């Protein structure tokens, strides 16, 4: 399993010109949830995945496996009541060749916009100075994890 180092921000609105960036639809649901471990299935455009994530905060362990669409379809009903639908835009930021994943949520979470960026190491994550368009950082707030959003909706 590989570790990922991410920072997450909540935006007031999508960044101006976001439609000019590459994007894809995402539907994901949670098969099993625990406080620090999640098992999810995800459809990203035409590809389907099974992912296990463990940990909290900005350093998490993730294992993602591409699965056959038929397996996704078999698991999807198990996620009823624990799903999110969003459009993900890939937005480059700064001269460091960082790319933010800006998620514009749909359905029950319509209006929510969240941006995440993965960093190569803790030093890069610590050194990152966020641009003005990024909102409040919620990396360490478990209420903003996708699994929590799928279960409880947008935090107040």
Regions found by a protein language model. Give the residues of each.
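Phosphate-end processing signature that detects enzymes handling 5′-triphosphorylated RNA
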Residues: 1-156
């Amino acid at each position: 399993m590989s570790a990922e180092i991410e920072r997450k921000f909540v935006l007031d609105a999508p960044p101006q010109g976001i439609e000019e960036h590459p994007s894809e639809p995402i539907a994901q649901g949670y098969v099993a949830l625990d406080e620090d471990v999640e098992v999810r299935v995800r459809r990203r455009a035409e590809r389907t995945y099974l992912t296990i994530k463990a940990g909290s905060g900005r350093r998490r362990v993730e294992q993602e496996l591409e699965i056959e669409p038929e397996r996704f379809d078999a698991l999807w009903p198990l996620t009823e009541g624990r799903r999110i639908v969003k459009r993900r835009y890939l937005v480059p930021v700064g001269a460091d060749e960082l790319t933010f994943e800006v998620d514009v949520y749909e359905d029950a979470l319509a209006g929510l916009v969240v941006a995440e960026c993965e960093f190569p190491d803790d030093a890069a994550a610590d050194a990152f100075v966020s641009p003005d368009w990024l909102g409040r950082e919620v990396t360490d707030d478990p209420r903003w994890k996708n699994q929590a959003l799928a279960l409880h909706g947008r935090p107040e």
